[in-house]
C-alpha cells in the first residue's frame, strides 16, 4: 500500500485537493483509496469523503498536541489501510502551530497552502513547508498573476527542492500533475523503522500536563522565556526580542 501525508494550515483547501486527487488517481488505475483525517476539535469533512465514496476515519486530538497525536496513531492508520486492502492511504492533518510537521522520511510529503493567506505566509509556516517533497498552492485563480509569482517565489525561498504545483480545488486543474507525481510512491506495510523528518514540540512543561494557573511558580519543566527591556526607552520601535520575540 502507498502512503501519502498531506498537511497544511486550516482552511487552505486540503480536503478539496485530496478529493480531486483521488478522482484522477482512480482514473489512472489506483482504485482502492482510503483516507485518515487528523484534526484538533471538530470536522465535517468526513461527509465530503463519504460522498466521494472514500472510506474515512477521523480522529480528534482534543487536549493532546496534534502532532503527538498524529505520530501516536499513524502506524495504526497504516495497519488499518493494509487490512482494508487499500492501494493507497492518504492522511490529512492541519499544521496548527507552524512549528510542527507530520512528514515521515521515505514517505511522500505534501504541504498545501493558499494564495489568500498572504504573500509572506510561506516564511511563517516552518518545517511543514520546509521539509515537504511537494508544495500545492491553492486559490491561485482569485489573485493576480503577480501575486501568484511572488507567493511562489517565497515558497521557493523556504524550500529550494520541493515540486510546486498549483491546484484548483473546485475545477481540479492541476490535480493530474499532482497525481502523476504521487502515483509511483513506494509500497509499505509498516512504519516501525521509519522516522519523522523533524522533531515534534517538547511537550514537557507543566501546561502540557494540564496546568492552567498563570505565574512563574506554576511554570515547571522546559520553558522558553523572552527578555523585555527595562523601560520603553531601551527598545527600538518594531524591534523583536532576541530571545524569542518575533517581529510581525
What are these regions (language model features)?
Residues 37, 59, 92, 110-115, ...:
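Conserved beta-strand segments of the P-loop GTPase G domain that flank and frequently precede/overlap
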Residues 53, 86, 106-107, 132, ...:
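Short, well-ordered alpha-helix to beta-strand connector turns
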Residues 2-16, 23-27, 189-248:
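P-loop NTP-binding site
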Residues 71-76, 176-186, 206-211:
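Short, surface-exposed amphipathic charged segments that create phosphate/polyanion-binding patches used
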Residues 2-12, 16-104, 140, 173:
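Nucleotide-state-sensitive switch-loop elements of NTP-binding domains
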Residues 42-46, 120-125, 147-154:
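Short, glycine/polar-rich helix-capping loops at beta-to-alpha or helix-loop-helix junctions
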Amino acid at each position: 500500500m502507498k502512503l501519502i501525508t498531506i498537511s497544511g494550515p486550516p482552511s487552505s483547501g486540503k480536503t478539496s485537493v485530496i478529493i480531486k486527487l483521488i478522482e484522477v488517481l482512480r482514473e489512472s488505475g489506483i482504485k482502492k483509496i482510503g483516507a485518515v483525517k487528523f484534526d484538533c476539535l471538530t470536522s465535517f469533512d468526513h461527509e465530503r469523503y463519504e460522498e466521494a465514496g472514500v472510506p474515512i476515519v477521523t480522529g480528534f486530538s482534543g487536549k493532546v498536541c496534534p502532532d503527538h497525536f498524529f505520530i501516536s496513531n499513524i502506524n495504526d492508520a497504516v495497519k488499518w489501510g493494509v487490512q482494508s486492502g487499500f492501494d493507497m492511504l492518504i492522511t490529512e492533518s492541519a499544521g496548527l502551530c507552524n512549528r510542527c510537521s507530520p512528514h515521515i522520511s521515505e514517505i511522500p510529503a505534501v504541504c498545501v497552502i493558499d494564495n489568500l493567506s498572504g504573500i509572506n505566509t510561506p516564511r511563517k509556516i516552518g518545517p511543514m513547508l520546509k521539509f515537504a517533497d511537494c508544495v500545492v498552492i491553492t486559490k491561485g485563480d482569485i489573485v493576480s498573476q503577480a501575486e501568484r509569482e511572488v507567493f511562489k517565489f517565497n515558497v521557493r525561498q523556504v524550500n529550494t527542492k520541493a515540486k510546486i504545483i498549483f491546484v484548483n480545488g473546485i475545477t481540479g486543474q492541476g490535480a493530474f500533475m499532482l497525481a502523476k507525481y504521487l502515483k509511483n510512491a513506494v509500497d509499505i506495510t509498516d512504519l516501525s523503522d521509519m522516522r519523522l523528518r523533524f522533531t515534534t514540540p517538547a511537550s514537557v512543561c507543566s501546561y502540557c500536563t494540564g496546568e492552567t494557573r498563570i505565574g512563574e511558580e506554576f511554570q515547571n519543566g522546559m520553558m522558553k522565556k523572552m527578555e523585555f527591556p527595562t523601560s520603553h526607552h531601551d527598545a527600538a520601535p518594531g524591534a523583536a526580542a532576541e530571545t524569542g520575540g518575533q517581529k510581525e
